[in-house]
Amino acid sequence: LITGLVTLTAGCKKKDMSLKLNEPRNIRGVVSYKRSFPDLNDKHLAVAQAVGICPPEDRDAAEKMKEQLIHITDNQFYTVDSLTHSIPYLVPRASELLDTIGSNFLDSLTAKGLNPNQIIVTSVLRSQSDVKRLRRRNGNASANSAHCYGATFDVSWKRFKKVEDEDGRPLQDV
């Protein structure tokens, strides 16, 4: 009887629903973004032209190229933002790279003692008409965008999506 009572009360233990805190360790900052992330558009564009598709004039033309592209949607590595000036397609090599970056980001957070978060994809394939519309709003947008080749994607550098705790505990922001 006592053994059964102990077993019964042990099974009724209340779940810990306190805020799951980050336990940061071994985190180093970036000294020079220019050196760490040499974002050279001419080199980027040359690679996109070599491995990408022929730039579609509009979204209808892009739809006709779907057999050459991978449709990207939310998965365990990343989430796709609401896209206003691009459509969620990439060439296979770029899609694989996006998966790798998302996976590496999750692994890096774990290694640094931080709660899991997914990267947020903010831009992918753009048609020529998407670029034209974007340039009206964003003076920094390139007329000859590597996004038009389906070999380029952007991710947010400051917004992330929390991966929900399997026990439902709230997580501290990263």
Regions found by a protein language model. Name each.
Residues 66-174:
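Cell-envelope/glycan interface and biosynthesis
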Residues 12-111:
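Extracytoplasmic cell-surface/polysaccharide-interacting catalytic and binding patches
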Residues 1-7:
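Bacterial N-terminal signal peptides
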Residues 7-8, 120:
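A general, composition-driven signal for non-globular sequence regions
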